[in-house]
Amino acid sequence: KTTPPSVYPLAPGCGDTTGSSVTLGCLVKGYFPESVTVTWNSGSLSSSVHTFPALLQSGLYTMSSSVTVPSSTWPSQTVTCSVAHPASSTTVDKKLEPSGPISTINPCPPCKECHKCPAPNLEGGPSVFIFPPNIKDVLMISLTPKVTCVVVDVSEDDPDVQISWFVNNVEVHTAQTQTHREDYNSTIRVVSTLPIQHQDWMSGKEFKCKVNNKDLPSPIERTISKIKGLVRAPQVYILPPPAEQLSRKDVSLTCLVVGFNPGDISVEWTSNGHTEENYKDTAPVLDSDGSYFIYSKLNMKTSKWEKTDSFSCNVRHEGLKNYYLKKTISRSPGLDLDDICAEAKDGELDGLWTTITIFISLFLLSVCYSASVTLFKVKWIFSSVVELKQKISPDYRNMIGQGA
């Protein structure tokens, strides 16, 4: 059933932005199906955005996105989180404002006068989230995929958190756990990562994170596994800069990846074999046929496009042979000329064969017609000669009879 998301802005309280930058967040919860798109200030904030993978729990997805901005610009300047869920035709805009006090006993003074707000009263206790491995790590044998368990809103008074990991209900002890202090609300965040085997994830094994803390009435368990379903390989198309762009200082290449399922995919760019960093991907979008598509745009200076031999769009997806497909576009004049000539020759040959076929057909028809006419004339002349000869030839038999 299609379910629109609920959107919650996550912002520090007044007085907690003491550093040079501040991180703002947007929690998108309770939607189905995938996917959603999160933009900040209509896309003008993009360089410091981090989007976390979606988590499926109880048939609904939850994901989050964060952006880091200079503390000198917020909250004096507006920051807005925009969430679009195409499947439900839902668009939600949330303005990020300093969070007000949770406790009414010791309220926070206005931000202009505030130096340090009291720590929030975390009556609800810690929250636990589990995240799947990066798809590139899963599909590349040289990398190590990891499942991540994140515990947030841990009180500084009871910071001890016990995290246990299970694979198909068998406990494992290879996880690495780190603790971080969240300055914006004076809480503890605990991150535990479990290295896993590639085949364990691909085969659908279940990974469980079990968390316990004094502020929890009972342990919290979160499970995750690879979503089962039809696997469809993507089709990849790489598009050169439009002709109108070539007169400008900057140009862009586009990689269109369509028709794939599931939605987990990795797209990267290289030029002459070297990794490119200046590109942006859309989130996978659910198409009308149930498959997904994605756009990736590589930006560069026009001079680089003119000087570089080739650019490649590298796609990794479980539906591909060896999980990998590379599409390359070349700026080499020789190669470009060959491609153009090849296409022109194909067109010329098609036209030439058509002309030759028509000519041969007409020639054979003409020969047949001429032969038929000639044969008819010869037959007519021969018949006339025979008839004439019969008329003028003397009747020697009668002549002999008369002589006798």
UniProtKB/Swiss-Prot annotation:
Highest taxon of the lineage: Eukaryota
Topological domains (Cytoplasmic): residue ranges?
A: 369-404
**GO terms for biological process?**
complement activation, classical pathway; humoral immune response mediated by circulating immunoglobulin; immunoglobulin mediated immune response; phagocytosis, engulfment; phagocytosis, recognition; positive regulation of immune response; positive regulation of phagocytosis; positive regulation of type I hypersensitivity
- Which pairs of positions does the record mark as disulfide bonds? 26-81, 149-209, 255-313
User: Which intervals hold domain Ig-like?
Assistant: 5-97, 126-225, 234-330
What residue intervals traverse the membrane? 351-368
Cell inner membrane is among the record's keywords: no
Query: CDD domains of this UniProt entry?
Result: IgC1_CH1_IgEG (cd21817), IgC1_CH3_IgAGD_CH4_IgAEM (cd05768)
What the entry says about post-translational processing? O-linked glycan consists of Gal-GalNAc disaccharide which is modified with 2 sialic acid residues.
Task: List keywords of the entry alphabetically.
Answer: Cell membrane, Disulfide bond, Glycoprotein, Immunoglobulin domain, Membrane, Repeat, Secreted, Transmembrane, Transmembrane helix
Gene3D superfamilies to which the protein is assigned, alphabetical: Immunoglobulins
The cellular component terms of Gene Ontology attached to this UniProt record, alphabetical and capped at eight, are: extracellular region; extracellular space; immunoglobulin complex, circulating; plasma membrane
What InterPro entries does the annotation carry?
Answer: Ig-like_dom, Ig-like_dom_sf, Ig-like_fold, Ig/MHC_CS, Ig_C1-set, Immune_Resp_Modulators
**Which terms in the Gene Ontology molecular function aspect does this entry carry?**
antigen binding
Residues annotated as glycosylated: 104, 185
SUPFAM superfamilies documented for this protein: Immunoglobulin
- Protein's name according to its UniProt entry: Immunoglobulin heavy constant gamma 2B
